[in-house]
Amino acid sequence: MFSGFVGPDDGEPTSDASETVQISSLALLKMLKHGRAGIPLEVMGLMLGEFVDEYTVKVVDVFAMPQSGTNVTVESVDPIFQMEMMSILKATGRHETVVGWYHSHPGFGCWLSTVDISTQQSFEKLCKRAVAVVVDPIQSVKGKVVIDAFRLIDNQLGVLGGEPRQVTSNIGYLKTPTLISIIHGLNKHYYSFNITCRKNDFEQKMLLNLHRKTWADNLKLGDVRSKREEALKLIESYGKAFEEEKNLAGKNPDMAKVGRIDYRRRLLEKCEESIMENTIYSLLYSIHRYIFTQ
């Protein structure tokens, strides 16, 4: 039946895996914040950017979609909301096009389910270079973001016995796939490619000032209740330690304290800290009262 088929070696190029997705810091923060807000359910959104060249996809911004998901799947895209959101973004100066979509996998890694594959197929019908980004907000900790980008493999290549994709890249390293992603069809139904997060000067200044304290932070009143509870626990622990010292008749008390917490010293430090904080809070309360009564 397929006797006349020559295969991908007849001069036709196969899909290249050396593309790189450049995600801006703003887009990455939005994806992580949106994903953490939806835990334990999946959330999804669209990515805005441009196709710079044949090997680069640039993502500059994202916006969330009002879809609700289960712990393993997420609903399809709402086209009405997408059109309204795109018109609003154009009015605010965002003229980028949709380059793909993202969704979260809270706690179970980066891969594509059958529903995700069908959603990606609908995107690739509109644009062959559409990208599906998966982010895990639970496994993503400070300094390491668990994220991956995928694109589908043409099923006809596998049926006809052709090579699904080729790797021709000078990136310099290969990303080792996880076992769960291989089980769910990585390099069989879809493939992964490199992700980079570049920061310009403005984004770098923004990230450096993200948690920077200002003069207004010094006017905030702290939580006094937690300080009191901590002091009460220290008093109870010091009382128990004092009773234990009474029972050490005929023994060296200094040797019994070796390797144990000195609750008396901690209690004195906590008292000095509380006195200083009470003085500051009294001053702040007077300042607030003077400001709001004028």
From Swiss-Prot:
Q: Where is the MPN domain?
A: 21-156
Q: Give the record's GO CC terms.
A: cytoplasm; nucleus; proteasome complex
- Entry's Gene Ontology molecular function annotations: metal ion binding; metallopeptidase activity
**Compartmental location:** Cytoplasm; Nucleus
Which cysteine-cysteine pairs are annotated as disulfide bonds in the entry?
none
Q: Which InterPro entries match?
A: JAMM/MPN+_dom, JAMM_MPN+_peptidase_M67A, MPN
Q: Name the positions where Zn(2+) binds.
A: 103, 105, 116
Which Gene3D superfamilies does the record match to this protein? Answer: Cytidine Deaminase, domain 2
- Membership in a protein family: Belongs to the peptidase M67A family.
**Biological function:** Acts as a regulatory subunit of the 26S proteasome which degrades poly-ubiquitinated proteins in the cytoplasm and in the nucleus. It is essential for the regulated turnover of proteins and for the removal of misfolded proteins. The proteasome is a multicatalytic proteinase complex that is characterized by its ability to cleave peptides with Arg, Phe, Tyr, Leu, and Glu adjacent to the leaving group at neutral or slightly basic pH.
| Subunit description | The 26S proteasome consists of a 20S proteasome core and two 19S regulatory subunits. The 20S proteasome core is composed of 28 subunits that are arranged in four stacked rings, resulting in a barrel-shaped structure. The two end rings are each formed by seven alpha subunits, and the two central rings are each formed by seven beta subunits. The catalytic chamber with the active sites is on the inside of the barrel.
Q: This chain belongs to which protein, by name?
A: 26S proteasome regulatory subunit RPN11
Please give the organism. Encephalitozoon cuniculi (strain GB-M1)
The primary gene name is RPN11
